[in-house]
């Protein structure tokens, strides 16, 4: 007895070879067209930015204002390259620990003496920088964060424990590290408009923080634009490292505490891989100064492949991030007590509001599985009530410096008006 297919299936079987032939051009067109479409959409935002902030020539960029630079950089940090902006900021701070004068001061203050203090210092630094870079240069929040940072540094500067050159070096890293990371690891390189914005913003912020750029080649005669300042501070920082980034046990001590923060939410079984990646992201000079071993050739190949794959996927397969999903790590508005909160946590949940999502969402489940605290645990230990900007810093500085901050803010409202810092 022979078996036969139902008429409908027989018809489908006869049509199938022809369907494959018909679908082949569509499939090929999709495989070619989709990556080209994604690439075009990704570059569309850069084109729109160039139209919105119209500086057609290098000469015209000399007129870029602090406010314009802030808006351009904010778009880069929140929409174009959020992951690398965050990562480069973390490694900028990490890199400063390769300078013995900096690492010795940190260990003497006791801020790296135990996990709670080192984790809070990391979060406090991130909060202050976030307030400075995510808010308009002429906003109250930016003024307070700049003034608070100046107050926290003032005592150490007066005693000679913080060197002016170390402050300029730290400022330089926060300006040049995003450029280096984006050039090496992102889906496109930066335009002159974006480079000028980074240089203009950080030069202006340095002025507000009282960090002089006079030591740079054009420091006394004047910089023509943000690109020139960025180029000169980049070269100067590399020369500074060549002289002062040398091996020291305190460098290693500071680096180990910082690495503990970066790897905190990684299962301990994966910590060796995390340490390999941390070493991979260092250059030879930094690695030697921190007394770290070079990553193995095998892991270096794996990390290089993963980063290259990420670059390809972002450039050709992943649509651009919509404005509704802009990445911001600080609350846009204060709560009823005029306090602000962090929106995410990397290690211990300092300044995180204990909402239902934060206590029961994916990040909370990861924390629970690793026996780590979640927002709201341990009473007020992790400041679930948030922060007043004027109180950010070590516990012994809480409630102090308010009068000095008010005086500094009066000065800032006169000196930092959002205009071009070069003219």
Swiss-Prot record:
Subcellular localization(s) per the UniProt record: Endoplasmic reticulum membrane
**GO MF:** oxidoreductase activity; polyketide synthase activity
GO BP terms in the entry: mycophenolic acid biosynthetic process; terpenoid biosynthetic process
Q: Where are the transmembrane segments?
A: 23-41
Q: Which domain of life is it from?
A: Eukaryota
Q: What is its EC number?
A: 1.-.-.-
Question: According to its record, how does it sit in the membrane?
Answer: Single-pass membrane protein
> Phenotype of the disruptant?
Leads to a dramatically decreased production of MPA and accumulates significant amounts of farnesyl-DHMP (FDHMP) in mycelia.
Q: Does the keyword S-adenosyl-L-methionine apply?
A: no
Which keywords are on file for this protein?
Endoplasmic reticulum, Membrane, Oxidoreductase, Transmembrane, Transmembrane helix
Q: Which reaction does it catalyse?
A: 4-farnesyl-3,5-dihydroxy-6-methylphthalide + AH2 + 2 O2 = (4E,8E)-10-(4,6-dihydroxy-7-methyl-3-oxo-1,3-dihydro-2-benzofuran-5-yl)-4,8-dimethyldeca-4,8-dienoate + acetone + A + H2O + H(+)
Q: Which residues lie on this side of the membrane: Lumenal?
A: 1-22
Record has Transmembrane helix as a keyword? yes
Q: Which GO terms describe its cellular component?
A: endoplasmic reticulum; endoplasmic reticulum membrane
The residue range of the signal peptide is: none
Q: Disulfide pairs?
A: none
List the InterPro entries: MPAB
Q: Give the record's pathway.
A: Secondary metabolite biosynthesis; terpenoid biosynthesis
Family, as annotated: Belongs to the mpaB oxygenase family.
What is this protein's name? ER-bound oxygenase mpaB'
Please give the organism: Penicillium brevicompactum
Recite the lineage of the species. Answer: Eukaryota, Fungi, Dikarya, Ascomycota, Pezizomycotina
The gene name on file is mpaB'
């Amino acid at each position: 007895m022979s078996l036969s297919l139902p008429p409908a299936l027989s018809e489908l079987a006869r049509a199938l070879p022809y369907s494959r032939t018909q679908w082949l051009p569509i499939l090929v067109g999709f495989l070619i067209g989709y990556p080209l479409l994604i690439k075009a959409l990704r570059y569309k935002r850069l084109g729109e930015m160039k139209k919105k902030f119209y500086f057609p020539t290098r000469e015209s960029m000399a007129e870029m204002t602090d406010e314009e630079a802030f808006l351009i950089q904010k778009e880069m940090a929140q929409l174009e390259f959020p992951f690398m902006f965050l990562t480069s900021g973390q490694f900028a701070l990490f890199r400063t620990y390769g300078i013995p004068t900096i690492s010795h001061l940190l260990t003497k203050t006791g801020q790296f003496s135990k996990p709670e203090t080192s984790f809070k210092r990391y979060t406090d630094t991130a909060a202050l920088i976030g307030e400075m870079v995510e808010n308009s240069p002429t906003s109250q929040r930016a003024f307070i964060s700049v003034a608070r940072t100046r107050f926290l540094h003032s005592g150490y500067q007066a005693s000679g424990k913080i060197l002016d050159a170390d402050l300029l070096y730290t400022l330089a890293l926060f300006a040049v590290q995003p450029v280096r990371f984006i050039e090496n690891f992102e889906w496109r390189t930066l335009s002159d408009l974006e480079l000028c914005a980074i240089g203009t913003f950080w030069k202006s912020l340095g002025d507000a923080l009282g960090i002089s750029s006079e030591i740079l080649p054009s420091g006394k005669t004047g910089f023509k634009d943000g690109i020139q300042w960025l180029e000169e501070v980049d070269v100067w920082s590399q020369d500074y490292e060549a002289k002062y980034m040398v091996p020291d046990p305190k460098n290693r001590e500071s680096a180990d505490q910082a690495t503990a923060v970066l790897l905190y939410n990684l299962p301990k079984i994966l910590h060796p891989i995390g340490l390999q990646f941390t070493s991979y992201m260092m250059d030879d000079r930094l690695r030697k100064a921190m007394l770290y071993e070079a990553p193995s050739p095998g892991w270096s190949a794996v990390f290089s492949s993963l980063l290259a794959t990420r670059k390809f996927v972002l450039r050709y397969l992943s649509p651009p991030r919509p404005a509704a999903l802009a990445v911001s790590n600080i609350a846009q508005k204060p709560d009823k007590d005029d306090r602000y909160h962090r929106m995410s946590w990397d290690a211990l949940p300092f300044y995180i509001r204990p909402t239902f999502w934060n206590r029961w969402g994916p990040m909370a489940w990861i924390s629970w599985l690793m026996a780590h605290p979640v927002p709201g645990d341990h009473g007020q230990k992790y400041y679930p009530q948030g922060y007043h900007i004027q109180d950010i810093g070590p516990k012994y500085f809480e409630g102090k410096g308010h009068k000095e901050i008010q005086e500094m803010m009066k000065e800032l409202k006169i000196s930092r008006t959002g205009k071009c810092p070069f003219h």
